[in-house]
C-alpha cells in the first residue's frame, strides 16, 4: 500500500489507545491541525460525550487530564474519544474495528450515522446486525466469499 493512500486513512482500533495528557491532547494526537473549539464541540456532542447545553463545562472537559489507561472514563467514553480523534483528522477513509462494542445500541447507531455523514469512506468490522443495516455494502466473513450489497439508509 502506498504511503499516499495511508495519509488519507484514520484508524480506530478495537483496543483504545490513549496518551498521557488532556482530553484535547488525546483528540488532537497525531494531527498537525488545531481544530477550533466549535468543531470539537460538534464532534464531541455528536458522539454523546458532551451535551448541547454544557456551556463552560465544555472547556473544562477538554482540559481534563487523563492517563493512558483512561482512569475515570468508562470503556464507551474511551472508545468515543478514539472515534473523535479519527474524525478530528478529517481523513477520506476511516477504519473502525468493533467501534461500538462498549456503547449502547441507539448511541452506536447515532455515532455511525454521524461518521458516515462526515467521511466519504467508512470501513467497519462489527458483530452488531443493527450497524450492518447502516451499510451500503458488507462482507459476510462466515461465508468467506459472499459480498452482499445492501441499501444503506440515509439517516
What kind of region is each of these model predictions?
Residues 10, 15, 23-26, 65-152:
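ABC-family ATPase nucleotide-binding domain "signature/switch" substructure
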Residues 2-9, 20-21:
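ABC ATPase nucleotide-binding domain
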Residues 24-68, 109-113:
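ABC ATPase nucleotide-binding domain helical subdomain, centered on the C-loop/LSGGQ "ABC signature"
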Residues 17, 32-34, 105:
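Alpha-helix boundary/capping and short turn/kink residues
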Residues 1-3, 42, 57, 117-118:
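Primarily ABC-family ATPase nucleotide-binding module
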Residues 1-3, 33-34, 144:
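Conserved post-Walker A/P-loop segment of ABC ATPase nucleotide-binding domains
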